[in-house]
Amino acid sequence: IGVASTKAFLGQMLGMYKIAYSLNGKEFDNQKIVDYIKRVLELDTLIQGIASQYYLYQNFIYIGRNTNYPLALEGALKLKEISYIHAEAYPAGELKHGPIALVSEDMPTLAICPQDSVYNKTLSNIEEIKARNGKVLAIATEGDEKISKIVDDVIFVPKVEEELYPFLIAIPLQLFAYHVADLRECDIDKPRNLAKSVTVE
């Protein structure tokens, strides 16, 4: 039984989406999400290759705006849990209030930047990081040629309605952490100092 429970994150998110859709008088299309997730899972080999370029780093920054910020938190948590890399997530809009001081060639950033309502602002944050010699890996929308010219590496996910991006972005974040941990020869199913259930406060 794996301690780093990726299914719990996706399951909770799916449950919340179904409640939100129901309260809005809409029906959530499970099959649509399943089909998109299958497409994202086909990126596994690509993500493994990208992970091979980052697994030796000891520190990582994750950034995102709006719903992408909680995803950044999940991505950073998974990376630190199973690969033992120090990873911190920040709202992209807060970069200039402190976190940008951490940017360097030795501390890459994973930027969540799909083509959504905050795309241009997040892209501007990425440009600020690149201007300070930071290395950036982005998760972006298929066909986004603009971001390809700015970042060092990119994982593309299918273009969907804005509210569905979290499902497509969570998978690459989790796969990236998995492959980094695997390359570092960490025990992915049983990370050190962690237990499946927390029994003490």
Regions found by a protein language model. Name each.
Residues I1-P108, V118, R184-E201:
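Active-site phosphate/pyrophosphate-binding segments
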Residues T6-K18, G25-V34, P108-E201:
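Phosphate-moiety recognition in structured ligand-binding domains
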